[in-house]
Amino acid sequence: MKLTCVLIITVLFLTASQLITADYSRDQRQYRAVRLGDEMRNFKGARDCGGQGEGCYTQPCCPGLRCRGGGTGGGACQL
């Protein structure tokens, strides 16, 4: 009787964990290498322009941003 209860609880627990995992991974890509490639493509160091709040002393600002607050250390890209 105790063994049956333990088995039923174990099956319910494993089923619940499978359902939770399925919901979590639904919107993620299947292959990790593809995700890593996308992350490397969008890496901050791979861009040729500075994003909002980044310094614009050594690189130009991205389209739609302007270099503001010029001082000794250079400005920052802002809207």
Curated annotation (Swiss-Prot):
It comes from the Eukaryota. Expressed by the venom duct. It is found in: Secreted. The modification 4-hydroxyproline is found at residues 60, 63. Its main location: secreted. Residues 23-47 form a propeptide. Disulfide bonds join 49-62, 56-67, 61-77. Belongs to the conotoxin O1 superfamily. The presence of a 'disulfide through disulfide knot' structurally defines this protein as a knottin. The cysteine framework is VI/VII (C-C-CC-C-C). Ion channel inhibitor that inhibits the increase in intracellular calcium upon depolarization in DRG neurons. In vivo, both intraperitoneal and intracranial injections into mice induce hyperactivity. This is Conotoxin Vi6.3. The lineage of its organism: Eukaryota, Metazoa, Spiralia, Lophotrochozoa, Mollusca.
